[in-house]
């Protein structure tokens, strides 16, 4: 089957992998160490998407706890110990990537730090689907999503065009990134960030899927 896309760019958390529990466990470990009560996994999941520093700030603010100067470093160390405890690819995702990789170039664009991103991709045997230079994290040379600079970089590197590129994500951040870059977008209803998507603002050609396998039908 011929793909209408030359490049397909995936978000990581909530799109390629279900990482909510490990993120929540690390955030709660930080909160408890600061004297706060832990939060529900779902509540912390709603704080994910803008990068680790923002997640830490949101969790501490929601708990009414002043932010310690080393809060981010502590969270990253706690997450590093846990990031593969429960994180797994969404059902069917490896098969989907294998098929899509024969139709188009694949890339990852996440606000997660690049070291954690690569550990997850390597640990779950997903790195083989993405060239090393097509994996962009939130602590590299480009501004974090929803700034479109990193997505535009990936488009140019793949010698694609904006309209031949599909951004796949689960959140309003991914949707705004695609809109700013002029690419097409597919939103993952199964992801834990989908509640942030302004459904009433979606364009007629913005796609929404309920499972990874539906990507093969686009």
List each language-model region with its residue ranges.
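Helix-loop "lid/cap" segments that line or gate small-molecule binding pockets
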Residues: 30-31, 51-65, 120, 154-155
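Active-site neighborhood of HAD-like aspartate-dependent phosphohydrolases
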Residues: 2-46
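Metal-dependent phosphoesterase signature
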Residues: 57-94
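Short, acidic loop-to-helix structural element flanking the phosphoryl-transfer center
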Residues: 4, 81-108, 114-118, 148
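Asp-based, Mg2+/Mn2+-dependent phosphohydrolase catalytic module
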Residues: 1-6, 114-218
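Short helix-capping segments at alpha-helix termini
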Residues: 32-37, 63-67, 125-130, 159-160
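An amphipathic alpha-helix signature
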Residues: 24, 28, 45, 49-57, ...
């Amino acid at each position: 089957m011929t793909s209408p896309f030359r490049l397909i760019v995936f978000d990581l958390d909530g799109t390629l992998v279900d990482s909510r529990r490990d993120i929540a466990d690390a955030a709660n470990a930080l909160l408890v160490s600061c004297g706060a009560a832990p939060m529900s996994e779902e509540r912390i999941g709603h704080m994910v998407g803008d990068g680790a520093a923002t997640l830490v700030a949101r969790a501490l603010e929601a708990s009414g706890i002043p932010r310690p100067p080393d809060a981010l470093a502590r969270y990253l160390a706690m997450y590093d110990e846990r990031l593969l405890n429960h994180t797994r690819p969404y059902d069917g995702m490896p098969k989907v990537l294998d098929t899509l990789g024969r139709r188009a170039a694949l890339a990852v664009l996440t606000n997660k730090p690049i070291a954690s991103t690569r550990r997850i991709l390597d640990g779950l045997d997903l790195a083989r689907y993405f060239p090393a230079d097509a994996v962009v994290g939130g602590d590299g040379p480009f501004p974090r999503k929803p700034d479109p600079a990193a997505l535009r970089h990936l488009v140019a590197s793949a010698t694609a065009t904006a309209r031949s590129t599909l951004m796949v994500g689960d959140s309003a951040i991914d949707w705004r990134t695609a809109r700013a870059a002029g690419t097409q977008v597919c939103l993952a209803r199964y992801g834990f960030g989908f509640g942030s998507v302004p459904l009433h603002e979606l364009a007629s050609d913005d796609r929404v899927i309920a499972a990874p396998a539906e990507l093969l039908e686009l």
